[in-house]
Amino acid sequence: MIYISAVGMINALGNNLDEIAANLTRGSAPGMRPRAGWLQGHPQAVLAGVDGELPLIPEKFAAHRSRNNQILLAALAQLQPQVDDAIAKYGRERIAIVLGTSTSGLHEGDTHVNLRTHEQPSTTWHYAQQELGDPSRFLSHWLALDGPAYTLSTACSSSARAIISGRRLIEAGLVDAAIVGGADTLSRMPINGFHSLESLSPTLCQPFGRDRAGITIGEGAGLMLLTREPQPIALLGVGESSDAYHISAPHPHGEGAIRAINQALTDAQLTPDDVGYINLHGTATQLNDQIESIVVNALFGERVPCSSTKHLTGHTLGAAGITEAAISMLILQRDLPLPAQDFSLSPRDPTLPPCGIIEKPQPLARPVILSNSFAFGGNNASILLGRVS
């Protein structure tokens, strides 16, 4: 069995685990608010940002200076002691880094292009900053590791797949530990891109709400240290699938998502009735919430409490999988109440197939949580975490 030895996280809920746990319990995200300068033709857009100072990247790593890598360092700092112990125990060549991202340092590239367009000097930009492989390369260099290091980019399931890949490397005997997770930061291109697709909500996103109008984009980073060393929280099972149906729309019957969840349950040797909570992908787009409701209804009916936390973190794109898996771990680790779905801006959509969406916080009845990530292109990943004796 693969265990989660440590976790670090930063997003609109807070800059460390204590802040995130407190605000998750309150149902309040300090970083979620209207922000200016991001959406072309609009004075403001509701975005979920990270506030406060971030770690500086020294001159030695100047080619990797991006906000994406800064928030990765902020997440890493929260599990640095456990990472140091793993390096001492296993050696630098026996630790992998597998990360997920959708945009990497795209914001820095965008800033560079704007400066050059207006014939202004651009002195801090390096091409490596916007490469998709840069987050894992940077972290590997930062920690002076010699094990496998690579980045996955499968849209919104990127970091969920990074968790699965890290587990696979350990099970294959290629490494003894894996630092897994991902990061994405606010960037004008995806914000304006989702707006052009009519998928960016003009207000705070409303997952499973009647008047839902699209996603709220957020930024964040999360990291987990996976090992075989027994810990209170384990990675019980995983599942992956591809719809092979459409470039952006999910399969109309959720066939790929159902396969991913069933794979995870089979891998964990569990049944749907063993699951105590489902952290839904719940993006608040019309199609995602409709299809995910079909999927959850088909497999779990209304028996299992579920909710989306994207009204608190925003959709952190490539970091969504690690963000929601880490939130699930926090619930298990600290016995937090399950986060309720907020229907204050829009009533629940009565046309969606019924599932166990909770509207008030409640305790976790069974110590197993399913975290789903269903990405563009039908790229699906499901992860089961649980407390173990």
Residue spans for each PLM region:
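ACP-dependent fatty acid/polyketide chain-elongation machinery
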Residues: 1-62, 228-236, 326-341, 386-389
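Glycine-rich phosphate/pyrophosphate-binding beta-alpha loops
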Residues: 12, 103, 155, 285, ...
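Structural signature of cysteine-dependent C-C bond-forming condensing enzymes
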Residues: 85-96, 114-124, 138-148, 171-178, ...
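Glycine-/small-residue-rich "gating" segment that lines the acyl/pantetheine channel
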Residues: 120-123, 164, 185-231, 245-247, ...
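Conserved beta-ketoacyl condensing-enzyme motif
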Residues: 4, 32-153, 272-288, 303
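Condensing-enzyme catalytic core mediating Claisen C-C bond formation in acyl metabolism
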Residues: 2-5, 17, 22-36, 42-44, ...
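Conserved small-residue
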Residues: 6, 24, 97, 139, ...
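Active-site pocket-shaping loop/turn-to-helix segments
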Residues: 58-78, 123-131, 149-161, 206-222, ...
